[in-house]
Curated annotation (Swiss-Prot):
One of its GO terms (molecular function) is rRNA binding. The gene is rpsD. It holds the Pfam family S4. This is Small ribosomal subunit protein uS4. It comes from the Bacteria. The keyword Calcium does not apply. The lineage of its organism: Bacteria, Pseudomonadati, Spirochaetota, Spirochaetia, Leptospirales. Part of the 30S ribosomal subunit. Contacts protein S5. The interaction surface between S4 and S5 is involved in control of translational fidelity.
Length: 207
């Protein structure tokens, strides 16, 4: 599947917010906070149209989870046909992706790194290797680091950094002694820290 592999700070500057795409070890806040989108001279901003504002919200969410338009649209279509609030269900579906859960548990410092771990078959789900980043987890599922990868300095460093920067969301439980974690509940809106207005995205796709 095609993926964006270019500079992630450029993406975050375009969206105007930190989308947690880059490790805090290397994140350059001076570059991020330069005025204006990348490649454009500083000038007074014009008024953003309603469509423009809706598009920016969609791009923020899509890029935060590393998705292309076709895949993101499938998540929206599924959410729109489910029972409940469409925007919140959309976020829930995205949070339940395996790459996101590996990131949320602190085994990877970005979702992009989590996808790499999964693609290289370093992640187990319920004791079986899974190499699909979009694999959807359910309540009761157990995520583990493959035995041979547990000694990697990546994992120990990532756990240490994650514990210092962010906690584990309450819908997950981590067992760092055994390099694993469990999905104990479905994520709710207040568990998700992304600065996105999901209802605006629903309005965009509803046109």
């Amino acid at each position: 599947m095609a993926r964006y592999r270019g500079p992630v700070v450029k993406i975050m500057r375009r969206e105007g917010v930190d989308l947690f795409l880059k490790s805090s070890y290397t994140f350059n806040k001076d570059k991020f906070h330069r005025k204006g989108p990348p490649g454009m001279p500083t000038k007074r901003k014009g008024k953003v149209s309603e469509y423009g504002a809706q598009l920016r919200e969609k791009q923020k969410l899509k890029r935060a989870y590393g998705l292309l338009e076709k895949q993101f649209r499938r998540y929206y279509e599924e959410a729109s046909h489910a029972h409940g609030v469409t925007g919140e269900i959309l976020l829930q579906l995205l949070e339940r992706r395996l790459d996101n859960v590996v990131y949320r548990l602190g085994f990877a410092i970005t979702r992009r790194q989590a996808r790499n771990f999964i693609a290289h078959r370093h992640i187990l789900v319920n004791g079986e290797r899974v190499d699909i980043p979009s694999y959807r987890l359910n309540v009761g599922d157990k995520v583990e680091i493959r035995e041979k990868f547990k000694t990697s300095s990546f994992i120990a460093d990532n756990i240490k950094l994650s514990q210092s920067l962010q906690g584990i969301p309450s819908w997950l439980s981590a067992d760092y002694t055994n390099f694993g974690g469990d999905v104990t509940a479905l994520p709710e809106r207040h568990h998700i820290d992304l600065p996105v207005k999901e209802q605006v995205i629903v309005e965009l796709y509803s046109k």
